Amino acid sequence: MSLAKLRTHYTADVKPEKVDNGQKITLAGWVHEVRDLGGICFVVLRDREGKAQVTLVKKKIDKELFDAARRLVRESVISVTGSVKFEEKAPNGYELLPEEITVLNVANSPLPMDTTGKVEAELDTRLDSRFIDLRRAETTAVFKIRHQALQATREYFVQNGFIETATPKVVATATEGGTALFPITYFDREAFLNQSPQLFKQILMSGGFDRVFEIGPIFRAEEHDTRRHLNEATSIDVEVSFADHFDVMEILENLVAYVYAQVIEKCKPSLETLGIELKVPKTPFLKLTYNEVIEIINARSEEKMHWGDDLGTFGEHIVGNYVYETTGESHYFIIDWPTEIKPFYAMPYEDRPEYSKSFDMMHRTMELSSGAQRIHIPDLLKSRIESQGLNPEGFEFYLKAFEYGMPPHAGWGMGCERFIMTMLGTENIRDTVLFPRDRRRLSP
């Protein structure tokens, strides 16, 4: 059977400006609900774009068709051909008066979980039966928004002269020298799943690519088991030649504002489904120095932060709330971090080398992005690698790119899932991933 016979329209396509009253159409999807009232039967058909009411009046329709509709099993796959009747009280403002209902696949009963929203399910239950959970309107809405956010991200980069790249995910050495790596067997050698495209982005700067971005998977073998950590995630990465950290911060904040604006414009039904009202963040974002952050935390907490400490969850909450209370905005930057707590490739200030030209972009109580101007001077880079207890020989492929004309450059990486999580106010980062991989979950 051809696609044209199974479906001519999505449910959301049936509008007075597109479809005539009485026009014959074919919808296809899942049986969301069956309401049998004796003399009348309502079948709610659900597809990717929404729901449509199929109305069968016993006295006006073939008995065999009426009885078949009453027997439909929830979540079975059907195709319905009939005539459109615009009706204000019906879902989406119309109902379909069927001439033919074809059952394409019958669902087992009972279902592993409810899809109507009448019965709540725990996240683990939903993830165990993800194929059913993805049929829920709220779940679908999240991934439609994620799709639009990534599409807008690509649009923004292309409009601003970036080249999209794809770097290796199987590597011979750690990107940042950490131990949080997944080892794999690569024929007769040990290899790792890449934790960041960082080193390859910088090599591309030596290659003259000038402005690059990548949207791809990263892998972190960290044993965190929290609502905001994943072991496989999607990273949005940027690298720009002839730029410093302030230049790429501007690119980042403008990207965030652009994506929000596009989601607001193009995802109205999904935002309504989730009950969310977004506003475009104001740019430029507030910039706080690391030292200012220490002062803010220590003035508001008995638990003190000392120079050289990372921010920590408690500090993120204090500073994020301070920024929101004073500016009404959620996004902000923390700049000028101590050199020793940033990766080896972060450029130190010439006049105060204990500080680096680095930044984190925050959203209230969560880090979304980390970036810096990079070291482009070979001797300094090698020295920084050694100072962090790493062997430069393991980075030979990377260091060579700096010996034959590396321009000054800067960049950042941002976690896609955290970006979506904070945009939508999602409680758990796993809600923003189709099939999340965390410390405890490897299936489905």
UniProtKB/Swiss-Prot annotation:
Binds 3 Mg(2+) cations per subunit. The strongest magnesium site (Mg1) is bound to the beta- and gamma-phosphates of ATP and four water molecules complete its coordination sphere. Its main location: cytoplasm. Keywords: Aminoacyl-tRNA synthetase, ATP-binding, Cytoplasm, Ligase, Magnesium, Metal-binding, Nucleotide-binding, Protein biosynthesis. It catalyses: tRNA(Asx) + L-aspartate + ATP = L-aspartyl-tRNA(Asx) + AMP + diphosphate. It is found in: Cytoplasm. One of its GO terms (biological process) is aspartyl-tRNA aminoacylation. The record marks 91 as: Important for tRNA non-discrimination. L-aspartate binds at residues 176, 220, 370, 374. InterPro entries: Aa-tRNA-synt_II, aa-tRNA-synth_II, aa-tRNA-synth_II/BPL/LPL, Asp-tRNA_synthase_2, Asp/Asn-tRNA-synth_IIb, NA-bd_OB-fold, NA-bd_OB_tRNA. Mg(2+) 2 binds at residues 367, 370. HAMAP family: Asp_tRNA_synth_type2 (MF_02075). Homodimer. Aspartyl-tRNA synthetase with relaxed tRNA specificity since it is able to aspartylate not only its cognate tRNA(Asp) but also tRNA(Asn). Reaction proceeds in two steps: L-aspartate is first activated by ATP to form Asp-AMP and then transferred to the acceptor end of tRNA(Asp/Asn). Belongs to the class-II aminoacyl-tRNA synthetase family. Type 2 subfamily. This is Aspartate--tRNA(Asp/Asn) ligase. The gene is aspS.
